[in-house]
Amino acid sequence: MRFVHISDNHLGFRQFGLFERENDFYDVFDRAVEEIIKERPDFVIHSGDLFEASRPPTRALLLVQRSFSRLKDENIPIYAIPGNHDTIMRKNTYPPQILYEMFGLKLISKKNPFYVQDGVFIGGSPYISKYYSKSLKERIKFLGERSKDYDKSILVLHQAIDKYLPHEFELKIGDLPKCFDYYALGHIHNRIIDDFGRGRLAYSGSTEIWKIDELKNYKKKGKGFYLVDLDGDIPDVQGVNLEMSREVIEEKIEFSEFEEDIGRLKRYIEEMETMPILYLTVKGDFDRSFVHKKLIDSLSNIS
């Protein structure tokens, strides 16, 4: 039994207000679907934040419709929860994922907290804020009890856990029951795999670089999704890396070496087929307007 664990695509995100960056998030999602079809998993688990917002742009909605239709044609069902970005924080409302039930998506919700596929228990909860953590813990406890009737079980959540995000979390690691074989988590954008209870706990991470603080983890572990094999006593978790649409560069330079370093960066960028994202920090005593103008003059004419 093999499945894909993917999360945090943030489709519709127009980073820096650039349509090129919005396209990058769409393109990498397309590549993810291609790779999933190649892997031929038994099902897909999506751990939230498929979209950047609860009211995604039409293009994002159509892209997901086309992608999930392809997975349905390949007999690959999808089990999904909404995350904090694509959850509508009002009663009696529906997340955008509900549009795709006719395309093979099974929405894990308060109404349908778990499903069973080929003897595997798949249970979870949509994102719940820390202000309602008591309700979240009660749901998790309920799912833990129900899962004990099955040989294999998966818990799907879109929450931060204190062990992995100590300054901003909704759950403590001790709040999780230890009876699941795989904990398919979303919300934290860095890739994480850990031993927990009788199985493995994993954040599959985002599929694109949403913030600069993800760059270090990306360079070390890549971005993409996990391919999980449940057949052994302990799940085997393999990362499938996706190619990014453009390079992300983070540079810190001294103002005293400004001209030399900008020239070096310009030559490096000119060799690229696609314009990168450049995060640049200039250190020293300088006039900000001068540096800004110099950067525009030096780098804006690269083609």
Located regions from the model:
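Conserved residues at the C-terminal ends of beta-strands
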Residues: 47, 186, 281-283
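Domain-start "cap" segments at the beginnings of catalytic or binding domains
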Residues: 1-23, 222-245
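Accessory, non-catalytic peripheral segments of nucleic-acid enzymes
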Residues: 232-303
